[in-house]
Swiss-Prot record:
It comes from Arthroderma benhamiae (strain ATCC MYA-4681 / CBS 112371) (Trichophyton mentagrophytes). Glycans are attached at residues 132, 169, 268, 451. Keywords: Carboxypeptidase, Disulfide bond, Glycoprotein, Hydrolase, Protease, Secreted, Signal. GO terms for biological process: proteolysis. InterPro entries: AB_hydrolase_fold (IPR029058), Peptidase_S10 (IPR001563), Ser_caboxypep_ser_AS (IPR018202). This is Carboxypeptidase Y homolog ARB_05721.
Amino acid sequence: MELYLNMLSFWYILLATSFFGPSQAVYQAPLSVDESQKVTIEEGFQIFTSKHSPQHSIRIKKQDGSICDAHSAQYTGWLDIGPKHLFFWYFESQNDPENDPLTLWMTGGPGYSSMLGMLEEVGPCLVNEYGNGTKYNPWGWSKKSSMLFVDQPVGVGFSYGDEGHDIPNDSYLAAVDMHRFLQLFISEVFPNKLNSPFHISGESYGGHYIPYLGAQIVRQNKLYPNEPQVQLKSCLIGNGCMSHMHTTFGYWETLCTTNPGVEKPIFNETRCDIMAKNMPRCMKVAEVCRRNPDPAICLSAQSVCDEGITGLYNKESDVKGGRNRFDITTPCQADDICYVQGLHLQNYLNTKLVWDALSPPKEVKEYKFASKNVEHAFGLTSDSMVPSTEEVEFLLSNQIHIMSYQGNLDLACNTAGNLKWMHDIPWKGQAELSSKALVPWKSVLASTGKNETVGRMKEVKIRVTDSATFATRYAFVTVDNAGHMVPQDRPDVAFDLMNRWISGETFV
């Protein structure tokens, strides 16, 4: 989210590489092991080594409910890829762990820990208001799916790299590591999930992470059919930063018009006029950056758009300025991410109780929810300036279902920009999707028990090839009265949305 902050200068948030993606499952404790597996025990961890890639191994241990009352089996550990070490936290489904799907969650940034998504949004437990414990989350996504949370890329959260080794600096490199992680996770550690449907979810810079990881999975499955196959079925992208150009374009509509929850425009006529005048030049230089993604060119384009459009709001998006780019109707409560829950979470994950349970290695000195080093590394490349359009198009053409869901109060990765970007994706369903109007969708609210309108949506189901045996779904779903983190703002609606999607149900 810090990237969000700077980026929302805007470029940064956009590109979220899709790349963490582990699958999960297992119910035995200890984990079951067959004779063909290479497994050792060390300092309380079981260590599984890949038969396909000997330099890859996973350290894993089972957790009880002392640090997170998950209502199901849970495991933590690290994937070791030579000098790189990725931390994960895995929860079996509370419903049917044998048959329910696997869902990976990736928080964005770049540089933000997926523990934010776990302990603030969709995990089975949430950090309490004091930052000294957790409470059960009745709307956690593990009620219907096994959930895997990974701190990625290396250098984020509890993940770390050996001294002297570089950290990944773009979405593709991150996706390569995550794909290997998934292969080892489902083939060696939890082989009973090898054939389970797999979904990739996340938010913000996840708009890059998710498509990149999804594309890596599809390509590697085709190239190496004899290696473990990750059974990717769909991607769920929440307020994704997909394209810097489109996100910036959406600033005017988000700040200068109204929508449910916004009774009058946030900006006055003077500021809206300034943005409108500067928009053509910003779009021109952004297009130059897109076609020539050299870091110097794109940084120059970013400066133009920041000065004339995004900076008019973003420079005031902190505690002092009072504005909140993640929810334009509420004030910023804490610098960097604007939400105090992030600080509570960070405090909790640094307690002795948690460290005794997780057993981080000596290389991990403390937990931080944001990594300046990873943010800086990505910022030196053109990764955040290049939209994830090609990866999304590739996934759709390979029959991977995609849902983009949007909290309408978000500015950082706004609804207006992402809807325009979605219409511009060149694929077989483009014409039909663009021609459709958004229609209301309903959800039964926990507060009233009534089936009420909660947003708008549209969807197409397209047979992408003549030989396709099923239609590929692409859905755009909005949620009113929610900002950048829909599951935090409207947990019951977000759970309903996720459950309908992975079970193949419609929204209207």
